[in-house]
């Protein structure tokens, strides 16, 4: 009898196993989380059954899956993996919508989905660009993995050095730009060799992993001065928050570094009240340079970023962000004299805490910043050439309020304290001479107020004013501005004008090079832009600009030149003086298409002239970063759910060789006219291929990139050696990167 019962049980189980399994259907829509546009050619996978579907032209998909709790995963190249949990009833149909976030960040439900394609960081700024995470990933470069390299391809941005992150906008130098992180001006965001005049062998790279960035914005001129103390463009980084959905891990290997990003919910997962994000990056750039550069300079870096975010209440949020990094440059000992630069060390740390309180009609934000930096440059013999230490502490408070539907006001105040010490010495014969030695501290305080008023639906006015005080010189400054936008159908006309001022730094005021009564630098911006929308996904923009500058700094007598037929060497003791007056004028043309399912990119051309006059000697010359013609082109096309191709092209007429140089019969000599000789024009085309492979909860992305596809020989300025008898300047230009293939990969768990 037991045997008979066992046989009957086995037969019943066999019959049950042959019964059809209950199934249901999932009908869904996949959207771009930023624009709300349907996404075509997206792979949607049911993790349990391995059933998959690909979205059509309308972004929709359908699949038949076993009933019960199902976990879907949407994957397409250029977007973060997106999980979706659904419950499928037997014989039922479930409707789902899956929004995808471009780049590396996960979709946040708090983000408002709109139909607008083009984002704005400052609604009234005539010329601006915002790069999201997806474009940063494609433009940063596999070789360098640097978000500032992504900015270099934006309209109006000029750069002529493959090895440096710094760039110029409308002739303005990097030191005159606002470089911000999470709303604070942050000067320590570069891995670089500091305080070295001979930058021929040096390079730089941003001290932040591109994978942790939410976006980066560029405002070329005429922007709202929430921070102030800069006369040029504004570049702002925003670090994304970690995933509140589940723990995630990303491991990447690029052409120069390896990195890991871990993130996940903070607190109970079901509550979704907070998140954490940790990133670490280690370079092996020195191995690459060893193969590409003849003198085998070694440059390495490491950095880490942390961001914690927590909702204290439904209306209050706290954030804490930390960046730390260090870099090391080592020149080959066999090619150096005992007094030459052999070792350059640089280390920085920045911490930012923020609190945000959102009310029905108002927003209140408070923030704290602390930053430290130290650097040291040593000779082969172990003598310090440069030794510097800097500290920064800041606090700021911002508030905004919607008074009426047509009137919005905002204001804020900040106090920043700085401490800086610097010692510099240079070899003189067999000994060293102290060139500069100072230590000081100062406080900068400022406040601003701004409004946005729309008297009619088609017109918006945005006036504002900022007041600043700098205790180092005892100077105060008032900086007003006004923006206006007029919309007529698909056409927008934006104009802006304002006064932008920058106080002198410690080196300009104290120490051997400083002048105690040096004035602040001032610039008046005048911008006018006309933008024409072409449907929902394209636009054309033309901008004309004029930046009038006065009281800009110069070290007269610091450069070697020919005077009355005699070679006059530059003085190492020359002091800073505010004696330059000049202008930067030009026009920028820009076409952009932003389409999630087709070709995206832009074409831009900028023509500019940047010239100065010394108000004491009446000497007139082109600015160091004057570039007459600038072409920047970028294109991206998604071939399938797994494959995309992109390319970027930068062409520039290039900058002057800074100093008094001239050319005669193919040779270069010290001359009588400053910035009369220019670096040869540059052109560089880079191509990139992305390919993804998806397995359930994991994805592998392979990157392949070729830098300088056309193998064009480009050059940068190199401080030359000068023959005192013939005045010849030898090795004035230095060759940059040839054609370089590179590859990388990214694991996502």
Name each model feature, range by range.
Residues 642, 651-665, 690-749:
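C-terminal beta-signal and adjacent terminal beta-strands/loops
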Residues 80, 87-95, 109-224, 234-241, ...:
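Periplasmic N-terminal accessory/gating domains of Gram-negative outer-membrane beta-barrel systems
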Residues 392-398, 436-448, 519, 525, ...:
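Outer membrane beta-barrel strand-and-loop segments of large Gram-negative receptors
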Residues 456-461, 546-548, 570-661:
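Gram-negative outer-membrane beta-barrel transporters
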Residues 10-116, 121-122, 453, 486:
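Periplasm-facing N-terminal accessory domains of Gram-negative outer-membrane beta-barrel systems
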Residues 185, 190, 196, 421-428, ...:
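Surface-exposed extracellular loop regions of Gram-negative outer-membrane beta-barrel proteins
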Residues 321-323, 400-410, 414, 435-550, ...:
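Structural signature of Gram-negative outer-membrane beta-barrels, strongest in the C-terminal barrel
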Residues 254-282, 294-328, 342-365, 401-407, ...:
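Transmembrane beta-barrel wall of Gram-negative outer-membrane proteins
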